[in-house]
Amino acid sequence: TMLQVAAQELGVHPSKISVSVGDTDSVGHTEVSGGSRITYTMSNAVNQACTRMLGLLRERAAAELEVDPQELEYDTGIFSSRVSQDKRLTLTDLGRQSLRRGGPVTATGAVARMQPAPAFSAHVVDVEVDMETGQVKLLNYTAFQDVGRAVNPTQVEGQIQGGAVQGIGWALMEGYQFSESGVLQNANLLDYKTPTATDVPFIDTVILEIPASDGPYGIRGVGETPIIPPLPALANAIHNATGVRIRELPMNPEALFHAMQGRGG
């Protein structure tokens, strides 16, 4: 996603951008890389760095072409003079000339704490409940989410689907079990159940784009929001199917069976 932001700001094809994974020890103190804040905040920093980079490149291009920097316009990786059309330089040209023009051009971007950009989501689910065993089967699942702007729609769709599956796990399966003496009884993934591909249907996603007021492109965080709606959506669907309202998690077959027995159904 950051690669796409840089390519957009620099006006070049994404294949021209390479991303190096840095060591966080080499940068200043910041908050954690989480909380659905990465795309929202980091894209702002990338945007700043690219803007500064183009400013420095404009000055070098102007010196090389012997024109005023304000005379140059930039488009798709090319600086050209508004006055003399034959005066033009590509980013490739500037790169080749960098050693005799002061070395490689570097620019940085940084953001302080930004105003929150809340994300909104609604999930719709159809379930089938076995009234004898309490087993819940998901038939259809659709997730709607306002993402501000989907810079990389494929990744956004994957995040929404992954978050929904995590929420489904919390709602129907996942929960620690302790003995009377406080010993954890399901400390491995054999006993601690999580959803697999056989437990969930294909999750349809509907991406809504209502830009946030802060940050480039109106981006909003995506990753955490889809985790929450599955819990009330499934609780409501189960209630609609059985008449039983479950108020504790997980809503597994045992819990649902006992709830239906307690209701007398």
Predicted regions and their residues:
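C-terminal catalytic domains of large/alpha subunits in multi-subunit enzymes
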Residues: 4-265
